[in-house]
Amino acid sequence: FASQRLFFALCTYLMFRGKRISYLELLALLLATIYMYQQTSTTSPFYLSILILTYVLFSIKIFKKEFIIENFWLKKIANYGFILALIITLYFCFYSSGNLFHLVDQFTHNRLRLSVEGFRNFGVSWLGQHIIFTTMDIFGNFTSNYNFIDSSFVQLLVIDGLIVSTFMLFALTKVMKYFVSIRKDIVLACLGIMIIHGMFDPQMLVLRYSPLILFISRLFIMNSDNNIE
């Protein structure tokens, strides 16, 4: 999981440095991303890391423009990014056409299919449930009945239940609205990349990877003088 750790570390570093980031730092982050991809061949964190580094380069260094904050529609999308991501994930799972479903499933290495199977096998309860996923056999090989749910959003619903999911979406939406209100463009871009990552990867709300839980814990004491960006 080194590639996932690097991805979240990169996003966290970009959020902390913000407009103070230098070309040398961006180059170092790019080289670290390329090296990690060569070692692990993990595509999702690699492509998303390249995307956010490109955004930061164009936003801060080349055009010196806050693309999200200065665009009315992107600002609205940012406010409700987590809710929109959940809606899109559920649409892909239950309402997308056969061709679109198979395209997304293939692009995400069967993770969409596993999300659908997770809903069918375990369902969604109000208070959540304890689930033991079947992943590998005693020899370390993937089993034929592998059923791990990779999507952070689907995990939230299936494992934590509707009540916790509602609270988490409410809290995360408050976080997004806060950063929109204080015009933290790079922070919003990084959070947006994390949201996209979380649609098909399970680390978004895991503390040892992602800072999102820390943002929620500081939700009611955040102020415009903090050190983020």
Where would I find each of the regions flagged by the language model?
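Membrane-interface micro-motifs in multi-pass membrane enzymes
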Residues: 1-10, 149-152, 157-161, 203-209
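Alpha-helical transmembrane segments of multi-pass inner-membrane proteins
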Residues: 1-40, 44-58
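A juxtamembrane structural motif centered on a specific transmembrane helix
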Residues: 17-21, 216-229
